[in-house]
Swiss-Prot record:
It comes from Aquareovirus C (isolate Golden shiner/USA/GSRV/1977) (AQRV-C). It catalyses: a 5'-end diphospho-ribonucleoside in mRNA + GTP + H(+) = a 5'-end (5'-triphosphoguanosine)-ribonucleoside in mRNA + diphosphate; a 5'-end (5'-triphosphoguanosine)-ribonucleoside in mRNA + S-adenosyl-L-methionine = a 5'-end (N(7)-methyl 5'-triphosphoguanosine)-ribonucleoside in mRNA + S-adenosyl-L-homocysteine. Its main location: virion. This is Outer capsid protein VP1. InterPro entries: Ig-like_fold, Reovirus_L2, Reovirus_L2_4th, Reovirus_L2_6th, Reovirus_L2_7th, Reovirus_L2_8th, Reovirus_L2_GTase, Reovirus_L2_MT1. It is found in: Virion. Pfam families: Reovirus_L2_4th (PF21062), Reovirus_L2_6th (PF21060), Reovirus_L2_7th (PF21061), Reovirus_L2_8th (PF06016), Reovirus_L2_GTase (PF21063), Reovirus_L2_MT1 (PF21065), Reovirus_L2_MT2 (PF21066), Reovirus_L2_N (PF21064). Keywords: ATP-binding, Capsid protein, GTP-binding, Methyltransferase, mRNA capping, mRNA processing, Multifunctional enzyme, Nucleotide-binding, Outer capsid protein, S-adenosyl-L-methionine, Transferase, Virion. Belongs to the aquareoviridae outer capsid VP1 protein family. The lineage of its organism: Viruses, Riboviria, Orthornavirae, Duplornaviricota, Resentoviricetes. GO terms for cellular component: viral outer capsid.
């Protein structure tokens, strides 16, 4: 982009092409103007008129007023705007009287006034001087003479200011602006006058011939610079001799009047060029002055010299990229002057000539007739003809997506350009890598039948308190957006408590009359002096949680309660729920033994305060092996159930323990479920810690050495080029090669004249991999940058943006992590990536030395010429066709998020498509494949707004139907693949709950909401990756399908009898070891090596369902995946045997319906509200165990026809995960007319009323004070929501109406 010093110019030329002919003013029209009732817009206009107080401080004058040079007394005592309007109106009318007295209108109406004489006459009249001499010469004949020649016929001194010779006229320049009371040039918003409010700011020399001009110039040569308009000068050719001295207020340095006039003319020229139209005639095409004496063009040290240099370009029609206001303020002119005097270069296309202005013949400028303009053809003039629309400045940095042209530079050239332009070191801001939310994991410790020795439980890692790990934990904590973390954790635990049931009765452990003690209640909250969760509990806004009868608070920092040391015996009563949000670090710090003692003491206090059958909850900062040993030694008999709740808010080992069913004869014990929970906890801790290692600490300047950071280049007035490799273009190419392309931002900010262009992006370990693959650095197409003229806000160097990435990005990141890990296998030589996508993201995931062939139906957005063709290739084509595979070679293949779309495009089902694809990959040489497939590995359950599963059409509908793809059930899909490749190992991969994939989110600067983690895991279980390895023999599993709690046999071929077995479930090793020394935390397991068959035999009785991944590790070698097997839970079938209609009971005695469902599933009655299943009032409906059977007990209510009840499975993670059986039989019940019935509100927040025979009967929302006859308030509420009453109604016909 072109610039003259600091003035940025658009590479487009635009001027008007038609000049307006000067029309002298007729006498009658002059009188009309002067007699106007409002002279605003006729003789003057107020530039800063304030309509509120009707004030103004700057007046712009029009002819003939603009010839007036006010008397010094007028200047010294300025009028306010009201007085000005009265003054000028009165004087104009008086002037009319003088004119008409001398020249009666009827005889002189059509005569033309000489504008020079008229202006001088009006000016002297306003100054109370004699105007007789001017009145004698007021008229002239425009067809015979010019305003100047009509005057030079009378060559003498007309007045002291108006001197006439035979070929010239000298007169002072009238004030083009009048300043009034309140004028303050130091105020930025004051309109600029350019010094033209000062009387005699310049002297004007009109001339009638060129010899006269020469004579005048000779006389003025020794004085100040003389300016001249060459194009259509007003009233005739003239020279302008600016007043000597300087004008204050426009710059920190002194500015001469000549320079200021030159600046005004250039600003006018640039504005007129921007607004020019071929259909509009203007006074002159070239608005700029031209210095004609006493001017040195050899340097550019002064404002006058620089403005003149710019003016020579303005003639051609150049336009400023910044709009010039119609009424420039002092601030606008100061800014323009500052930019013009800033660092930069002059234009050198058009040289200065004293008496001539050069113009480009191809420009739209049409020169006037005369000697003052000459054509000139500059070399390499980069402008073209065209208009430019000023685009409003942007309110933020602009995102730039790179596009490449067919050109490269060497890596060394790119590095050199980067070093010359890089901003380094940078001070970056981090933003927040966690925007909010919580990821909650829940483990049923007591529900696991297999004991596990406490002494063998995994312990807190030895390096947990190492300085580096503590620093990274603190960094992660500070990278979470501000929120009440305690409230978020509390809500996660109470959401679980709302679903907690007695395993024997299936009833909620918290009944409707429970009391609650909150231990560790603190007043240190942003908007409350008590724990924030208590407001939600009191209001009943936690679905399924009854409102406590009372809540009592204890702790160190309590306000609404009692101060108490809860590690000691306490003098209190007992409560149905004791919630201990106590920090052992408060007393113990990082002293682990002391923290263990404090935790055990606090647990004892909580249990002592809990009513029989109640619930105790304890927060434990460090769940160490020593702590668990003490728990089971001291308190194993104190409760019926034990759950571990882990709300991940920050990266700590803190957990909540939930002891249910307080008693004295319990039998709690350490189980394999506890070991799995701890393994998962510490694995997630380690994963987050690894992710944070990529993030620099606060306060560390970014010098380019950290994995995650910002790379930036700054260029001043860059001239990007798509034709040559210059510094700006090279620097841009270098930057783009270093950063994530989708993260690149672009800013343009004025910087004391030059425009500072900053281009920056996010540097990550992934972008480093792509850069390492480049052989040369590709050059970018810069048309979008060259087009940018708007300014932006300054750059913001922030590592994490403000919005969390969507769930789909989390899944993609998890798969990126997996593919990256898999392709590090040194045995891979040539990868084929199907459905790559134009952006070629695979290049950032795989080792830079791995040969890769990418393919997609769309053209490649990368410049493939910048890569070594022996290592990197891109094939554009449809891989679903046979023709695509001609000449394709590989030894491995990936297809991520492409097969479903390809199958849909081909119009075939997924299994058939895979059966067609896999042989083609194998024929191309592929022995390993990673195929992402649409198949529900676990429950066939939709994810609202993400994936809707259409069971009839066998398709997934993504994002509300935005994309529709076929899916296949995993068993027939796997069988079809095994039939094609019977000797291949098959392994499924989904996102692990241990979050080992988080480095590919946090580590690359992507923020996330922790609540999305569990959703992303569920999404991946619907769209898993299948790893097919034809070099590895498959697992042989018997039986298939493999049911839960039944022994199965898994045979694993191996030539190494000393290989170590590892079986993983959800990212955690659950079986590991060697024959005779195998440890299992997922059920009984035995391992032996059968030498004759060269195989391992794993006999396994699984206690948990899901997918298990098998690995064998030979000494000194990496683990080898050997396949995966699936343990299936029992069928989710539910059968409900309702009583016959004639035997239904409509009283509070209720009814029972026999439930047939596998006892593996614990059931509860719920409604679906606000996107989730919510447990109903157990008095309304509940599941009752009558061993060995289970019954649905329910009380009928008129609301039942309007609220659908569900039988839902209950798991530690929630309700309805696998079973949500609609109880339509109750929903469709016809209520009798001859029997009393019951009526309640439908659900929390719902309203209803009753009518009878079409007439209003009773409101249930706002019941009347006096109930209708026969209606009674029931002693027992059997409403869906426990807080609402139930009414008994006499026999009758009722209509239940939802409000």
């Amino acid at each position: 982009m072109a610039a003259v010093f600091g003035i940025q110019l658009v590479p487009k030329l635009n001027t008007s092409t038609t000049r307006r002919t000067f029309l002298p003013l007729r006498f009658d029209l002059l009188l009309d103007r002067l007699q106007s009732t409002n002279l605003h817009g006729v003789l003057y206009r107020a530039l800063d008129f304030n309509p509120v107080d009707r004030s103004a401080t700057v007046i712009q004058t029009y002819p003939p007023l603009n010839a007036w040079s006010p008397h010094p007394a007028f200047i010294e005592n300025p009028l306010d705007y009201r007085d000005w309007t009265e003054f000028i109106h009165d004087r104009a009318l008086a002037f009319v009287g003088v004119l008409t007295q001398r020249y009666p209108l009827t005889q002189n109406a059509q005569r033309y006034t000489n504008p020079l004489v008229l202006g001088a006459a009006f000016g002297d009249f306003l100054n109370a001087r004699s105007i007789d001499i001017f009145l004698d010469r007021l008229f002239y004949g425009p067809t015979q003479e010019s305003p100047i020649t009509s005057i030079t016929k009378f060559p003498y001194q007309w007045t002291i200011d108006f001197n006439v010779t035979a070929d010239s006229v000298r007169t002072p320049a009238g004030c083009k602006y009048i300043t009034l009371y309140g004028y303050d040039p130091s105020r930025p918003s004051t309109p600029a006058t350019y010094g033209k409010h000062r009387p005699t700011y310049a002297t004007v020399f009109y001339y009638s011939t060129l010899p006269a001009r020469s004579r005048l110039l000779a006389n003025l040569a020794a004085g100040p610079t003389v300016l001249e308009h060459f194009d259509s000068p007003t009233y005739g050719p003239h020279l302008l001799l600016p007043q000597t001295g300087d004008v204050l207020g426009y710059s920190s340095s002194l500015i001469s009047q000549a320079a200021l006039l030159m600046v005004e003319s250039v600003m006018d020229a640039l504005r007129d060029n921007a607004n020019a139209s071929a259909s509009t005639a203007v006074t002159r095409l070239d608005q700029s002055y031209h210095p004609v004496t006493s001017f040195d063009p050899s340097t550019f040290n002064t404002l006058l010299q620089r403005a003149t240099n710019l003016a020579l370009l303005a003639v051609q029609g150049v336009q400023s990229e910044s709009a010039i206001p119609a009424i420039p303020t002092m601030s606008d002119v100061r800014s323009f002057v500052a930019r013009l005097m800033a660092e930069g270069d002059p234009q050198q296309w058009f040289p200065y000539r004293v008496d001539q202005i050069l113009y480009w013949p191809e420009s739209p400028f049409v020169p006037p007739i005369g000697p003052f303009y000459a054509p000139f053809r500059p070399v390499n003039f980069p402008f073209t003809t065209g208009s430019y629309t000023v685009v409003p400045d942007a309110s933020r940095p602009l995102r730039l997506l790179p596009q490449y042209r067919n050109a490269t530079i060497t890596v060394q050239q790119a590095d050199d350009a980067y070093e010359d332009t890089a901003l380094s070191p940078l001070i970056t801001t981090h933003g927040f890598c966690v925007t909010g939310g919580v990821s909650t994991s829940i483990y049923d410790i007591s529900g696991d039948p297999t004991a596990y020795p406490p002494a063998q439980l995994v312990d807190t890692p030895n390096d947990y308190f190492d300085r580096e790990r503590m620093a990274r934990r603190d960094l992660f904590r500070r990278l979470r957006a501000p929120a009440d973390r305690s409230a978020i954790k509390d809500r996660a635990v109470f959401d679980f408590l709302a679903s907690l049931v007695n395993p024997t009765t299936a009833n909620p452990v918290l009944d409707t009359s429970f009391s609650m003690a909150y231990l560790g209640a603190s007043s240190a909250h942003a908007n409350a002096d008590e724990p924030v969760i208590l407001a939600d509990i009191r209001s009943g806004s936690i679905p399924g949680l009854p409102i406590p009868r009372r809540i009592v608070q204890f702790g160190y920092d309590v306000v609404h309660g009692s101060l108490l040391d809860l590690s000691r015996a306490v003098p209190t009563g007992t409560f149905g729920l004791v919630y201990a949000d106590l920090d052992q670090v408060e007393d113990a710090g990082t002293d682990m033994p002391a923290a263990n003692r404090a935790a055990i003491a606090m647990l004892g206090t909580a249990l002592q305060m809990t009513t029989a059958g109640g619930v105790s909850v304890l927060k434990v900062n460090f769940p160490t092996r020593a702590f668990w040993t003490q728990v089971f030694n001291l308190y194993a008999t104190h409760a019926t159930t034990l759950h571990l709740v882990k709300p991940t808010i920050v990266n700590s080992s803190e957990v909540f323990l939930v002891f249910g069913g307080r008693q004295s004869n319990g039998a709690l014990r350490s189980t394999t479920a506890l070991q799995r929970a701890l393994l998962s906890l510490y694995a997630r801790n380690a994963a987050i810690d690894r992710a944070v290692t990529h993030i620099p600490f606060f306060g560390v300047p970014d010098d380019g050495t950290s994995d995650l950071g910002i790379d930036a280049v700054r260029l001043f007035d860059p001239m990007f080029s798509d034709a040559v490799a210059n510094l700006p273009s090279n620097a841009l190419a270098s930057l783009v090669s270093r950063v994530v392309p989708s993260s690149i931002m672009f800013t343009r900010v004025p910087s004391n004249g030059p425009v500072s262009t900053t281009i920056y992006g996010k540097r990550t370990f992934l972008s480093n991999r792509r850069r390492a693959r480049l052989r040369d650095v590709p050059m970018l197409i810069t048309t979008t940058l060259v087009h940018q003229r708007r300014f932006t806000t300054p750059p913001t160097f922030t590592l994490f943006s403000s919005e969390a990435v969507p769930v789909t990005t989390l899944v993609a990141a998890g798969y990126n992590s997996f593919i990256s890990e898999q392709t590090r296998n040194p045995n891979l030589a040539h990868l084929l990536d199907l459905g790559t996508g134009p952006e070629c993201r695979i290049l950032s995931l795989i080792p830079p030395t791995l040969q890769v062939t990418m393919s997609d139906a769309r053209p490649c957005a990368e410049l493939m010429a910048s890569f070594d063709p022996a290592l990197t290739a891109y094939v554009q084509g449809d891989y679903s066709t046979a023709a695509f595979w001609n000449g394709i070679r590989c030894d491995s293949a990936t297809a991520i998020f492409t097969l479903g779309a390809a199958a849909a495009a081909a119009g075939t089902d997924l299994i058939a498509f895979v059966q067609q694809l896999i042989p083609r990959i194998v024929a191309a040489g592929g022995t390993r494949m990673w195929l992402q497939l649409n198949t529900p590995l676990y429950e066939v359950s939709s994810l609202p707004d993400l994936i809707d599963i259409d069971l009839r059409d066998r398709v997934y509908r993504f994002n509300g139907g935005e994309r529709v793809e076929p899916y296949a059930d995993p068993v027939p899909l796997q069988q079809a693949i095994a039939a094609l490749l019977p000797a291949a190992a098959l392994s499924w991969h989904t996102l692990s709950p241990t979050c080992d994939w988080l480095p590919y989110i946090i580590g690359v600067g992507s923020p996330l909401n922790l609540s999305d983690i569990n959703t992303a895991i569920s999404y991946s279980r619907l769209t898993p990756i299948l790893h097919i390895d034809t070099t590895t023999p498959p697992l042989r599993v018997n039986p298939v399908p493999t049911p839960l709690n039944q022994q199965c046999a898994i045979r694993i071929t191996s030539l190494d009898p000393a290989a170590v077995l590892s079986v993983q479930h959800n990212g955690v090793e659950v079986i590991g070891g060697t024959p005779g020394n195998v440890i299992s935390v997922a059920g009984a397991a035995a391992l032996q090596y059968i030498l004759a068959n060269q195989e391992f035999l794993l006999q396994f009785t699984p206690t948990l369902p899901g997918i298990f991944d098998v690995f064998l590790t030979t000494l000194g070698q990496p683990p080898v995946p050997r396949g995966s097997f699936t343990i299936t839970p029992p069928p989710t079938t539910v059968v409900l045997n309702m009583p016959p209609p004639g035997q239904l009971d409509f009283t509070d005695v209720g009814n029972d319906a026999r439930i047939t469902c596998d006892p593996y599933y614990q059931l509860a009655v719920c409604i679906f509200k606000d996107g989730q299943y919510v447990r109903v009032n157990p008095e309304k409906a509940s599941v009752v165990t009558n061993a060995p059977n289970r019954d649905l007990h329910f009380v009928l209510d008129l609301a039942d026809n309007h609220v659908l009840l569900y039988l839902c499975d209950v798991t530690p993670s929630g309700l309805g995960d696998r079973i949500a059986f609609p109880i339509v039989d109750i929903y469709r019940i016809a209520f009798p007319r001859n029997t009393p019935v019951r009526a309640s509100l439908p659900y929390t927040g719902g309203g209803a009323h009753l009518t009878s025979g079409g007439n209003p009967f009773m409101s249930l929302t706002t019941p009347p004070a006096v109930l209708p006859a026969g209606v009674a308030l029931a002693a027992l509420s059997t409403s869906v929501a426990t807080q609402y009453p139930t009414y008994t109604l006499p026999a009758g016909v009722y209509e239940y109406v939802i409000e």
